[in-house]
Amino acid sequence: MLALRLLNVVAPAYFLCISLVTFVLQLFLFLPSMREDPTATPLFSPAVLHGALFLFLSANALGNYILVVQNSPDDLGACQGTSSQRPQRPPPSTHFCRVCARVTLRHDHHCFFTGNCIGSRNMRNFILFCLYTSLACLYSMVAGVAYISAVLSISFAHPLAFLTLLPTSISQFFSGAVLGSDMFVILMLYLWFAVGLACAGFCCHQLLLILRGQTRYQVRKGVAVRARPWRKNLQEVFGKRWLLGLLVPMFNVGTESSKQQDK
């Protein structure tokens, strides 16, 4: 339990550090290298377009991250403890989280990177957080590849060029041919690639469970759920204003997921 609580503190700090490092690299390395194009117009220069797109992806990723933390699931155990009525039988999807020490409705899993449980209240923000984190990481990787290609005069036309970049760069770094800053960017390329793929896979997995009307806890425990139309399952999680929530981080308003009780 001590290890889990320690991980619950280290993982959010790790995510925030990676986000800060990514922002610094974009601001002080990638964007200045794009301003050197004299043929581009000031309004539609690559630096302006790249900066606007990166800020959009980062703002949505961090905004939904904050909403996941703020909109933590309600503690049903505390509500039943303060109620004077006879406690009802909890729905099959409720679960007691040992890390958070509370009972949550439609518990899916505990996310250590947010330090919070994922349930009915913050599921949509969690999925959008995974989506935009994946896009921001993969986009940063593409920008980093362009930067390394220009600085080190490396061609990535060959399919295996990215796979052989790390071992080749390590040997050149110890021989003095590659600077420490460039080596750090190369290491970040692989980190962005790994985090981007992991978040994309997790986002797709969560969407598949939502289409089926299930949670990870229900799948793990073998709890049977009532068959419902997939569109209704999506609406309960994303609400009627799903398009606005896709563009701007916002609280999941207008859904019935927090009021749903499993049969």
Curated annotation (Swiss-Prot):
<feature type="topological domain" description="Lumenal">
    <location>
        <begin position="31"/>
        <end position="47"/>
    </location>
</feature>
<dbReference type="GO" id="GO:0006612">
    <property type="term" value="P:protein targeting to membrane"/>
</dbReference>
<feature type="transmembrane region" description="Helical">
    <location>
        <begin position="183"/>
        <end position="203"/>
    </location>
</feature>
<feature type="transmembrane region" description="Helical">
    <location>
        <begin position="147"/>
        <end position="167"/>
    </location>
</feature>
<feature type="domain" description="DHHC">
    <location>
        <begin position="91"/>
        <end position="131"/>
    </location>
</feature>
<dbReference type="InterPro" id="IPR001594">
    <property type="entry name" value="Palmitoyltrfase_DHHC"/>
</dbReference>
<keyword id="KW-0472">Membrane</keyword>
<keyword id="KW-0333">Golgi apparatus</keyword>
<dbReference type="GO" id="GO:0005789">
    <property type="term" value="C:endoplasmic reticulum membrane"/>
</dbReference>
<keyword id="KW-1133">Transmembrane helix</keyword>
<feature type="topological domain" description="Cytoplasmic">
    <location>
        <begin position="1"/>
        <end position="9"/>
    </location>
</feature>
<keyword id="KW-0564">Palmitate</keyword>
<dbReference type="GO" id="GO:0019706">
    <property type="term" value="F:protein-cysteine S-palmitoyltransferase activity"/>
</dbReference>
<protein>
    <recommendedName>
        <fullName>Palmitoyltransferase ZDHHC22</fullName>
        <ecNumber>2.3.1.225</ecNumber>
    </recommendedName>
</protein>
<comment type="subunit">
    <text>Interacts with CNN3.</text>
</comment>
<dbReference type="InterPro" id="IPR000731">
    <property type="entry name" value="SSD"/>
</dbReference>
<dbReference type="InterPro" id="IPR039859">
    <property type="entry name" value="PFA4/ZDH16/20/ERF2-like"/>
</dbReference>
<dbReference type="GO" id="GO:0072659">
    <property type="term" value="P:protein localization to plasma membrane"/>
</dbReference>
<keyword id="KW-0808">Transferase</keyword>
<feature type="active site" description="S-palmitoyl cysteine intermediate">
    <location>
        <position position="111"/>
    </location>
</feature>
<feature type="topological domain" description="Cytoplasmic">
    <location>
        <begin position="69"/>
        <end position="125"/>
    </location>
</feature>
<dbReference type="GO" id="GO:0005886">
    <property type="term" value="C:plasma membrane"/>
</dbReference>
<keyword id="KW-0812">Transmembrane</keyword>
<dbReference type="Pfam" id="PF01529">
    <property type="entry name" value="DHHC"/>
</dbReference>
<comment type="similarity">
    <text>Belongs to the DHHC palmitoyltransferase family.</text>
</comment>
<feature type="transmembrane region" description="Helical">
    <location>
        <begin position="126"/>
        <end position="146"/>
    </location>
</feature>
<feature type="topological domain" description="Cytoplasmic">
    <location>
        <begin position="168"/>
        <end position="182"/>
    </location>
</feature>
<dbReference type="GO" id="GO:0000139">
    <property type="term" value="C:Golgi membrane"/>
</dbReference>
<comment type="function">
    <text>Palmitoyltransferase that could catalyze the addition of palmitate onto various protein substrates and be involved in a variety of cellular processes. Catalyzes the palmitoylation of KCNMA1, regulating localization of KCNMA1 to the plasma membrane. Might also mediate palmitoylation of CNN3.</text>
</comment>
<feature type="topological domain" description="Lumenal">
    <location>
        <begin position="204"/>
        <end position="263"/>
    </location>
</feature>
<feature type="transmembrane region" description="Helical">
    <location>
        <begin position="48"/>
        <end position="68"/>
    </location>
</feature>
<keyword id="KW-0449">Lipoprotein</keyword>
<dbReference type="GO" id="GO:0005794">
    <property type="term" value="C:Golgi apparatus"/>
</dbReference>
<keyword id="KW-0012">Acyltransferase</keyword>
<feature type="transmembrane region" description="Helical">
    <location>
        <begin position="10"/>
        <end position="30"/>
    </location>
</feature>
<dbReference type="GO" id="GO:0005783">
    <property type="term" value="C:endoplasmic reticulum"/>
</dbReference>
<keyword id="KW-0256">Endoplasmic reticulum</keyword>
